[in-house]
């Protein structure tokens, strides 16, 4: 239904920690509503958002929205479509209407923790391919502020020696404190620059 609505939201969180945006849509019990009130649990879509929507195995952001006459707790954020981000919310004070403006403020400590763990999955993947061989492919992942899970394919159980070598190499890279930069590229540009892409894998 949402995919046919034409609603779009732009993620601005790579270069902004907070943002002011217009509320495009409020959904309660799977229906569009004009307004929501204290105690309501709703989904909110805004024109722009600094909230990261769950995708690629990384958990979505939590935080708050606030505006004239309302405060909202953002419990979770999802990204069901590439250009659509949905905030799962609870109205904690006042009432909010479609077209209202809101300040969107993610929990930055949680965001940074999730980013660290997301980066760690890439480090681990690179080390696994170096230690075990280039056949190793990411088969799934879960990245959250408190930790991460990384699933991969290999033809045998890992020996204690291999596990220790992998841990040592990962820790060595972390201790180098290499600066991490976010660069948004077109697909072919990313592949040409050496990025690994296993898009036939679903997880």
Predicted segments, located by residue:
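A glycine- and charged-residue-rich anion-binding loop/surface
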Residues: 1-203
């Amino acid at each position: 239904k949402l995919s046919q609505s034409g609603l779009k939201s732009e993620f601005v969180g790579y270069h902004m920690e907070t943002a002011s945006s217009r509320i495009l849509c409020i959904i309660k019990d799977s229906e569009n509503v004009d307004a929501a009130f204290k105690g309501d649990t709703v989904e909110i879509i805004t024109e722009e958002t600094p909230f990261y929507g769950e995708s690629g195995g990384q958990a979505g952001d939590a935080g708050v929205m606030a505006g004239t006459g309302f405060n909202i707790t953002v419990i979770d954020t999802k990204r069901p479509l590439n250009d659509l981000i949905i905030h799962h919310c609870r109205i904690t004070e006042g009432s909010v209407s479609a077209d209202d403006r809101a300040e969107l403020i993610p929990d930055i400590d949680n965001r940074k923790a999730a980013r660290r763990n997301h980066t760690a999955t890439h480090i681990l993947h690179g080390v696994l391919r170096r230690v075990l061989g280039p056949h190793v492919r990411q088969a799934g992942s879960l990245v959250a502020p408190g930790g991460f899970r990384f699933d991969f394919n290999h033809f045998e159980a890992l020996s204690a020696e291999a596990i220790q070598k992998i841990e040592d190499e990962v820790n060595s890279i972390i201790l180098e404190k290499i600066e991490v930069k976010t660069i948004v590229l077109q697909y072919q540009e990313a592949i040409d620059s050496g990025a690994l892409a296993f898009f036939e894998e679903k997880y």
